[in-house]
Amino acid sequence: AVGSTASIVNMLIGLFAGLSTGAGVVISQAYGAKAEKRLSEAVQTTITLTFILSAVATIIGILIVDPMLRLMDTPEDVLPEAKAYLTIYFAGSTGLLFYNMGSGILRAVGDSRRPLYFLCFAAIVNVVFDLLFVVGFRMGVEGAAYATIISELLSALLVMYVLTKTDAPYAIKWKSLSLHFSAVKQIFSIGFPSSIQQALTSFSNVFVQSYINFFQTDCMAGYSSYNKLDAFILIPVQSLALASSTFVGQNYGAGQLKRGRDGVKKTLYMSIIVTAALTVLTMIFSGPLLSLFNDDPGVIEYGKKFVLIISPFYVTICFNQVFAGALRGIGRSTAPMIIMLSSFVAFRQLFLYCNKVFFGHSFIGTALAYPMGWVVCSILMIICYKRSALGKASDDAAGAVVK
């Protein structure tokens, strides 16, 4: 039941992660330019927006639970539990939003360690409370939901504590929280396209899930188990893409465009090496890894099929994620949005439809929808990056900034 909710949860995360990215770019540019007043205004605006958006997310999230689950063709036998999980999750989504925004601020000023430590702490707390609520108190999916929102709230409190206690210009000043129009405009101009892209991509995954739901229950469970491995493999490249955005933003603010380009190259190389290594390990040990989430032989067999079909394409994600992050770092977020929506939404849905019409809803065709979207997106993103000011930055123009 929890596995069937992933697309809806990711839609919420994607929507606000985009705004977090926008805030991070604005803050990193101000930090790189050593503009302390602009930096402080951006931080106070970010936290104020988080209060407003968390209330909106809670209300809208609870209202869309039932329609979204039915849109996914969620089987009736798991519908009540999935609905219970999502209702609790959205009701407690404030912690997630504050952690995302707060950690985005820290990463924007070069502090990526503490958000990672807090995230690891939250993961451990989540496991402990999962065991306590689900195994100990036998609360089922409701217990899993409570464990998740408690762990997210604790991570948010830790991030807020760090940002409150610092003496740096990016400190949160609770008595001075307000919306500065210039900061709001910048955050939304950069973050809104990213939010739309991530939310609509997750929304399209609702339909992908409906294609998965066409197959038997073992396939659904196998896909859910595979998704957990997928999330693990993608953590490094997504983190490096965020680092790319921050690094480029700081150097863009400081007028060092060529240095930003060099950083993007190194980030891309690192992401390819790490992703390739994780891909090989996952393919070799797919059986034991999948059994950690579900030990049913039928479920494991389907999970291994997803790993075998999709995993060889993971390296292609490095190109679209790193280059998209770099483009956002210089304030160009509309182009990545258009490219990703075209690839991850339009092309993917067309691919699935053709698979259904011409190949009778084949399993392999359904599984290939994701990697084919990655390939198309990477090709388009490489072209866009090469044509950008960042991609064209020359060794003779180390300090040039092209608006």
Predicted feature locations:
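Small-residue-rich hydrophobic transmembrane alpha-helices
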Residues: 2-59, 96-115, 209, 223-286, ...
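Short alpha-helical transmembrane segments in multi-pass integral membrane proteins
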Residues: 27-94, 136-192, 248-313, 356-403
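Transmembrane helical elements of multi-pass membrane transporters/channels
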Residues: 88, 99, 122, 151-155, ...
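Hydrophobic/aromatic residues in alpha-helical transmembrane segments
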Residues: 23-24, 64-65, 102, 129-130, ...
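Small-residue hotspots at the loop-to-helix junctions and early N-terminal turns
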Residues: 3-7, 82-86, 145, 217-232, ...
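Helix-terminus/linker motif at the lipid-water interface of multi-pass membrane proteins
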Residues: 1, 69-76, 132-139, 199-232, ...
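Membrane-helix interface segments
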Residues: 112-114, 141, 218-219, 333-334, ...
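Short runs within selected transmembrane alpha-helices of multi-pass transporters and secretion channels
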Residues: 20, 88-107, 115-123, 144-157, ...
